[in-house]
A protein has these predicted regions:
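Long, intrinsically disordered, low-complexity segments
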Residues: 18-22, 126, 202, 296-354, ...
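An aromatic- and glycine-enriched ligand-binding surface/loop that stacks and positions planar moieties
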Residues: 20-100, 176, 208-209, 225-232, ...
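Extended glycan-interaction surfaces of carbohydrate-active proteins
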Residues: 207-210, 393-436, 519, 564, ...
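Conserved, well-structured interaction surfaces
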Residues: 39-55, 59-70, 93-173, 187-223, ...
Length: 583
């Protein structure tokens, strides 16, 4: 945090910030901006210059996929799902976070690897985003060529950037040290940690301040900027997280849990607040339209898969509410492509996906003697279309339009793996990625639908919640859930639906945490051996499940893992941060 404070202070001493950080394709304040004597008045002398400060704030927003040397690559250029039950890392190198810190239980407040943790408080980029946003808010009044409406909208964008940045911290560590202004060099560096409740309230407060001034949806030119729909959706996400049982309970989630990491009691009103946020979102959606689930062009498995793909992959559509960008073309994701063979989805995840008609896939499916083909029958998919878009399964095409190397007699098969590969964002062929600008779909409309359904179910029961879940299912051709489903069964159905819809979108980890799903952290994980009837372009397979290497958590589970440890050296700096339970 003192590094963060130092950055905030230096930016004012040396002309607000390193102006080279603000150069996007053209020279901002000369060829040697750090020594040019640039000051606040220069940086806010025009709308164009001021926008570069706000753009810098945008560039520090979280991006869930590895992107080159970006400072917030997590888990050693791996994915958050690799420490959930959906995905397993097999990368035996020294920098891999899952294998070196999580699967063996070695992560601690004093033991870490650079960029190998899921989240390292004080070393992430959120405070950079906050820094630039506050500088913008405090100085944009100096800009002479902006209308009042333009100024208010840009300030609202900056406030949402701050709220989103704190929201990321909140989900990983609970209460945070809150900076609500740009820091003066001679300011006393004391920022006491806020409680869990205070942090949630402040995030929601910033969003409430931003919502009235944001556009509901941006036009094509401004696409990627923050919107009212995104702010309202993020508000629901935070309220739902805070209302969930891990934090909203009379029973503490850990013996050392305190006011910084939970409420310490149960209140139904927290669920009601989440439900109200959902009501407000859908009331606005009914009035303004413009957002909707991307629908298939025809009622076929391939069309449904492509509609689902467009919903998460494509910029400027009707589904992504918060889009974060790190680059334009597919090369932005080269690190992901390069590492695609060294981790794999678990059979546990694959088994969550129902048959194509919506019927549950059997828990006791006989893989050695299947009564029905589990992936393809005469070339036609037999399962939920989202399975194939999230997971490369035996018989599908992969990356460069060749057979996915996931069956044992494929010439490129790797013995260290799960028998599956990640498909999402990687896709089947180069043509799928060409001329298709990339993004991180930080928040999508299906999450708002399912979050609202969850809140309704917890407050009122299933009846009024079902239609929101069924919208998500119907888009990919699945049948409605039973109309007589009970509250607990619907709760499970929603959590599963979220796993299916948001694979590799950083949703599953937080769902497991907020619902205290210790059994999912401890359960055995499986892979699947598949052998094709021929080496090239097989049309049928034989199968055999196998156990993946047990993680430390299986026999040594501790709920401390629900929140990240605070590095001890951060606490020792004495500005106000405290340790999380169990660490």
């Amino acid at each position: 945090m003192k590094n963060i404070i130092k950055l905030l202070s230096i930016c004012l001493v040396c002309g607000v910030c390193s102006c080279s950080d603000l150069t996007f394709g053209d020279k901002f304040l000369g060829s040697q901006p750090e020594s040019s004597g640039a000051v606040l008045d220069s940086m806010f002398s025009s709308k164009v210059n001021a926008d570069k400060v706000l753009t810098s704030a945008y560039t520090y927003l979280p991006y869930g996929l590895p992107t080159g040397a970006a400072p917030n690559n997590k888990l050693g250029v791996n994915l958050l799902e690799a420490i959930s039950d959906l995905y397993q890392s097999f990368r035996n190198n020294a920098s891999d976070g899952p294998t070196n810190l999580y699967y063996n239980g070695l992560l601690s407040a004093n033991n870490s690897l650079a960029n190998a943790e899921a989240y390292r408080y004080g070393s992430e980029s959120q405070y950079n985003a906050i820094r630039y946003a506050w500088i913008y808010i405090e100085n944009v009044a100096k800009v002479p060529d902006m209308t009042e409406d333009e100024r208010n909208e840009r300030i609202a964008e900056a406030k949402m950037i701050i709220a989103l940045s704190y929201a990321e911290m909140f989900r990983y560590v609970g209460g945070v040290c809150w900076i609500d202004h740009s820091i003066e060099p001679n300011e006393t560096m004391e920022f006491p940690r806020l409680t869990f409740a205070e942090t949630a309230d402040k995030i929601v407060g910033l969003l409430n301040e931003a919502i009235p001034y944001l556009k509901w949806k941006q036009d094509e030119i401004e696409d990627g900027r923050m919107t009212k729909a995104g702010a309202m959706g993020l508000k629901l996400r935070i309220l739902l997280f805070a209302a969930s049982p891990t934090f909203n309970s009379d029973i503490k989630w850990h013996s050392q849990a305190d006011e910084y990491t939970c409420y310490g009691n149960y209140s139904k009103k927290r669920w009601e607040d989440a439900m109200k946020a959902g009501q407000e979102f859908f009331a606005e959606l009914d009035k303004r339209q413009e957002y909707a689930l991307t629908q298939p062009a025809e009622p076929t498995a391939q069309a449904r898969r492509l509609a689902y793909r467009a919903g998460y992959y494509d910029r400027g559509g009707t589904e992504v509410l918060v889009s974060i960008r790190r680059g334009y073309n597919e090369s932005t994701h080269n690190n992901l492509f390069d590492q695609r063979f060294y981790s794999g989805p678990t059979l546990n995840y694959v088994n969550m996906f129902p048959w194509a008609d919506g019927e549950d896939f059997p828990e006791n499916f006989n893989w050695e003697h299947p009564s029905k083909q589990p992936f393809f029958e005469n070339g036609e998919p037999t399962r939920d279309p989202r399975l194939y878009e999230n997971v490369a399964v035996p018989g599908d095409r992969y990356f460069n339009d060749t057979q996915a190397p996931v069956y044992t007699n494929h010439q490129d098969y790797r013995a260290e793996g799960s028998g599956f590969l990640m498909m999402k964002f990687i896709l089947q062929a180069a043509s799928d990625r060409q001329n298709r600008p990339v993004q991180w779909p930080y928040l999508r409309l299906p999450e708002v639908l399912l979050s609202y359904a969850e809140a309704i179910n917890e407050v009122e029961g299933p009846e009024n919640a079902l239609s929101y879940v069924n919208q998500v299912r119907n888009r990919v051709g699945l049948s409605d859930l039973p109309s007589n489903i009970g509250q607990s069964d619907l709760r499970e159905a929603i959590l599963r639906e979220r796993a299916l819809e948001f694979g590799f979108e950083e949703v599953r980890w937080f769902d497991l945490v907020r619902w205290g799903r210790k059994d999912d952290f401890r359960k055995k994980l499986y892979g699947l051996y598949s052998k094709g009837d021929k080496v090239n372009n097989p049309t049928s397979f034989t199968f055999a499940p196998y156990e993946l290497t047990l993680r430390y958590w299986a026999n040594n589970w501790d709920s401390k893992w629900y929140m990240a440890p605070i590095p001890q050296k951060e606490i020792n700096k004495g500005y106000g941060m405290t340790q999380n339970p169990g660490w």
